[in-house]
């Protein structure tokens, strides 16, 4: 199983990215959810503008699909500057980063997605650029090689990562602002779904938006993807308008249940319950039982189930919680 093939995957495809870009909020006033992040960024941005400074370097981390790229775009728009976008894997050589840095205008934003994947060589170039707005470049080779310093305009680096723990300490410590994005609450997701529906020219009831939001795993990217598939269903099977009943029919047909679980989520939970009596079960046995790689279980399937309280990871193995038993209408065994 490939994570990107799942309807409830938080990862993004290139085509999807282009569609989502059109419906993203452009300013903090339009930004829904993440109230602490929003209120803090309002102050930091306003203070930087009052002083006439570039905003401090910003690190944004959290699960995929929660709006790290959206927030970077909002920062650039609020500051009234250009946004230059790249990613850690793309910056293979020090020269790749140097080319981007030397093309920045004063106060511009450089956004590096997947910043935890920067190579050590590129990261070393970034340190003086972040601290002193200087670029150290080696000219020539061998004994004749010499270092020259190039002054850079003040700029803001925004780094985004799903794995903050993978950042080196020297890099992490150079960010003046660090923001963590959390899974969204259902009312906020409902607002996002309604807003996206309006952008798409859809007739959708509040209850229909709520039904999509409930099944979106706390993630705006998934909410927008489910909305597009519900739209298809409504246009083909009905008159195009989306009620709660139409949304539920569409998502049931797509095998996304009331908790936002798909076939693979349910397969894993039912294996623990039916084949291993609720657990504990070792990871290798569980992987063999459902025909998946252990890495897929650890990195793709487990995190959301654990976060929502349906699965426990214990020293003896994985266990289904009472909530998991109840989800399938199965009576959990009596505890000894």
Swiss-Prot record:
Catalytic activity: ATP + H2O = ADP + phosphate + H(+)
Binding annotation for DNA: 294, 313, 318
Cellular-component GO terms for this entry: cytoplasm; Holliday junction resolvase complex
Region of interest (Small ATPAse domain (RuvB-S)), ranges: 185-255
Region (Large ATPase domain (RuvB-L)): 4-184
Job of this protein: The RuvA-RuvB-RuvC complex processes Holliday junction (HJ) DNA during genetic recombination and DNA repair, while the RuvA-RuvB complex plays an important role in the rescue of blocked DNA replication forks via replication fork reversal (RFR). RuvA specifically binds to HJ cruciform DNA, conferring on it an open structure. The RuvB hexamer acts as an ATP-dependent pump, pulling dsDNA into and through the RuvAB complex. RuvB forms 2 homohexamers on either side of HJ DNA bound by 1 or 2 RuvA tetramers; 4 subunits per hexamer contact DNA at a time.
Protein's name in the database: Holliday junction branch migration complex subunit RuvB
Organism encoding this protein: Klebsiella pneumoniae (strain 342)
């Amino acid at each position: 199983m490939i994570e990107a093939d799942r309807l409830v995957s938080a990862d993004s495809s290139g085509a999807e990215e282009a569609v989502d870009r059109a419906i993203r909020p452009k300013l903090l006033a339009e930004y829904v959810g993440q109230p602490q992040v929003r209120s803090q960024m309002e102050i930091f941005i306003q203070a930087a503008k009052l002083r006439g400074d570039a905003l401090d370097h910003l690190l944004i981390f959290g699960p995929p699909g929660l709006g790290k790229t959206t927030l970077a775009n909002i920062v650039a728009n609020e500051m009234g500057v250009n946004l230059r976008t790249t990613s850690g894997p793309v910056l293979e050589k020090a020269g790749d980063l140097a080319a981007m840095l030397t093309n920045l205008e004063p106060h511009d934003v450089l956004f590096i997605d997947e910043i935890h994947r920067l190579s050590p060589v590129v990261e070393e170039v970034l340190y003086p650029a972040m601290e002193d707005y200087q670029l150290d470049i080696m000219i020539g080779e061998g004994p004749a090689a010499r270092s020259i310093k190039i002054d850079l305009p003040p700029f803001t680096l925004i780094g985004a990562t799903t794995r903050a723990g993978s950042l080196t300490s020297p890099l992490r410590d150079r960010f003046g602002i660090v923001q963590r994005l959390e899974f969204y609450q259902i009312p906020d997701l409902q607002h996002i779904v309604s807003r996206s529906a309006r952008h798409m020219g859809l007739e959708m009831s509040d209850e229909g938006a709520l039904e999509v939001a409930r099944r979106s795993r706390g993630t705006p990217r998934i909410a927008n993807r489910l909305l597009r598939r519900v739209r298809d269903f409504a246009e083909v099977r009905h008159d195009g308008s989306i009620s709660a009943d139409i949304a539920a029919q569409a998502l049931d047909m797509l095998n996304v249940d009331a908790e936002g679980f798909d076939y693979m989520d349910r397969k894993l939970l039912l294996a623990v319950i039916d084949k291993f009596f609720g657990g504990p079960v070792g990871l290798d046995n569980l992987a063999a039982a459902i025909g998946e790689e252990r890495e897929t279980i650890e990195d793709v399937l487990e995190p959301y189930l654990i976060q929502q309280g349906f699965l426990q990871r214990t020293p003896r193995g994985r266990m289904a919680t009472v909530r998991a038993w109840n989800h399938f209408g199965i009576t959990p065994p009596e505890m000894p």
